[in-house]
Regions:
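PAPS-dependent sulfotransferases, especially Golgi type II membrane carbohydrate sulfotransferases
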Residues: 1-7, 131, 136-139, 150-159, ...
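PAPS-dependent sulfotransferase catalytic core
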Residues: 1-56, 71-85, 90, 204, ...
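Alpha-helical scaffold elements adjacent to nucleotide-binding pockets in ATP/GTP-utilizing enzyme cores
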Residues: 24, 68, 178-182
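PAPS-dependent sulfotransferase catalytic domain
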Residues: 82-189, 221-222, 229-233
Length: 272
């Protein structure tokens, strides 16, 4: 007798659509979100007892590499100071993540707004986001993407009973069909008459969800990025050389004219 799925956990890199996915599932299905199995971003060292995961749906999510790098380079979550700037460091330095520890010399929080007394940060290497093969730092962000994608493709399905890997673009452009597929495949209980579309970020009433940032990388940089990506793996995931989602080979009919809804003022025309 199959066990009814009651919980879900998400696995995906930063800036890969994990928050959008979480809100979409919570808004439409009778499931609770769990973090009992570990971090959604730093998942390669998580521990799973396959025999006891029957009531949990594990969803991996990946994103077009150019859009992902474009966003991640501007939203530098858990990135050490040395890799934050210039862009060349972010792309080609040894890649590792840090735990952000706020060091406040004055307990009066108003000092944050005084330029003469800003908050300072102390960084500690996050050992759960090291190379899971060697236990060392990744050569660069491209090796990190390749190995963590490999984990989601090949290893994660062997660790738990209910796992599926989806593309952020499918969820974004084929929302109803993607949620319907999840519902049918895993016998999920839908709580809405029709699927509700997420518009607000993490239940915020003011912070609207941004579907895609406008690509700010110049064409020569995009070509350089593809030269460092594992093109065979990317093709397996549905991504091909190009700088827009028209190159995403979704299994559904998509609207290729969906506009970007956010632009970034950062200049990334050079990587030096």
């Amino acid at each position: 007798m199959s066990v009814q799925i009651k919980k879900f956990a998400i696995l995906g890199e930063r800036c890969s659509g994990t928050n959008f996915l979480e809100e979409s599932i919570l808004s439409n299905f009778n499931l609770t979100h769990t973090i009992e199995y570990g971090s959604k971003h730093f998942f390669c060292f998580n521990k799973y007892d396959k025999a006891n995961t029957g009531d949990t749906l594990f969803i991996g999510i990946i994103r077009n590499p150019i859009y992902w790098l474009n966003s991640f380079s501007k939203e530098l979550y858990h990135i050490p100071e040395i890799n934050r700037s210039p862009l060349k460091n972010f792309l080609f330095n040894e890649f590792y993540s840090v735990d952000d520890e706020l060091d406040v010399s004055n307990n009066n929080n108003t000092v944050f707004f005084m330029n003469s007394h800003p908050y300072t940060y102390k960084y500690k290497t996050n050992t759960k986001d090291l190379n899971y093969v060697t236990g060392k730092k990744y050569k660069n962000i491209f090796e990190m993407r390749k190995l963590k994608n490999k984990y989601l493709i090949n290893i994660m399905p062997t660790q738990v009973k209910n796992f599926i890997l989806i593309n952020y673009e499918d969820l974004l452009y084929n929302y109803d069909q993607t949620l319907s597929d999840l519902k049918l495949k895993f016998n999920l209980i839908q709580t809405t008459k029709k699927f509700e579309i997420v518009t607000k970020y993490k239940k915020s009433e003011t912070y609207k969800f941004v579907r895609q940032r406008l690509i700010s990388f110049p064409e020569n940089l995009i070509k350089l990025l593809w030269a460092n990506l594992d093109v065979n793996q990317e093709a397996q995931l549905g991504y091909f050389m190009g700088n827009n989602n028209a190159h995403f080979k979704t299994k559904y009919i998509v609207n290729k004219d969906v506009p970007n809804t956010d632009s970034c003022n950062e200049s990334t025309s050079q990587i030096m």
